Amino acid sequence: MPRSGLNRAVNEPRRLTLDLPTRGGAVAVLDWGDQARPVDLVFAHANGFNALTYRTLLAPLAERFHIWAPDLRGHGAATLSTATEARRGWGDHGADLAAVLDAIKGPPVVLAGHSMGGTAGLLAAVQRPERVRGLVLADPVIWSRTTVLAFHLPILRDLPRRSPLVVNALKRRSRFDDRDAAFAAYHGRGAFKGWPDAVLRDYLSDGLVPDPDGGLMLACTPQWEASNYAVHAHDPWRAMKALSCPTHILKAEAGLACHVPERPFGLPRVMVETVPDSTHFLPMLQPEVVRGALAAMLEAPDAA
């Protein structure tokens, strides 16, 4: 591809709609880089966000690599079901990503993600080991082994539904007159504290959709965001034990999401690095660190 084409790909990702018939719908995919080469990297976003939120992180890599970033179920332009009845864990997100991997032609890819997207990537990697040659997980949501076991007990299964994350998500304002109003409401506050303006605007670009009653509304509804916080009957520890590819976890220094120690016993494929001065939102606040880890895995010999 000519250099001018690469520049356009970096600044303006192509937008694809990927039908997933085995999953009952479709996902929207941002496609960066040279389409003449196979997909190198698949990146999954965190709960409540969307693929475009990570443009600042991913776009510079598109000069050398072909990148897919899907909107997960219930986010962005995905059309997969968001029914919450009888939902118990993130197995749906993992299976959706496995279906995305099935749709990719070519050699195995590096699979990466942030927060819930990282955990979903982990679950997908053990379902499709032949399609993944490496994992990079930015502060994935992985509770302690004891907590994960507790979440599988019927008596404690609904405990997360009373957590502040769930309560606050359900209270979240979901409608705005326009994107400028949403920007003013979010800028410098809550989870968005410290975010560069460009990253916040990228989030809002795909994070808001037309409201039938006028104005804009959140693409990821408060109910779906809360459901993701409330269901944890999946087992990332079992998945890590089953991994057949090298895995690099970037753990936030000031974070409560990832409880994998730096030297996890019995997990020889997993390397954990605590990022100094980082929070759970390190892909937004320290993109160069995450980008470096992605590039290192992409450039590594195939070790899967």
Predicted ranges, named:
Residues 22-32:
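A short loop-to-beta-strand scaffold at the N-terminal edge of the catalytic core in hydrolase folds
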Residues 30-82:
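Conserved HGGG/HGGXW glycine-rich cap/lid loop of the alpha/beta-hydrolase fold
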Residues 198, 207-265:
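Conserved serine/cysteine hydrolase catalytic core
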Residues 278-287, 291:
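Catalytic histidine-centered segment of alpha/beta-hydrolase-like enzymes
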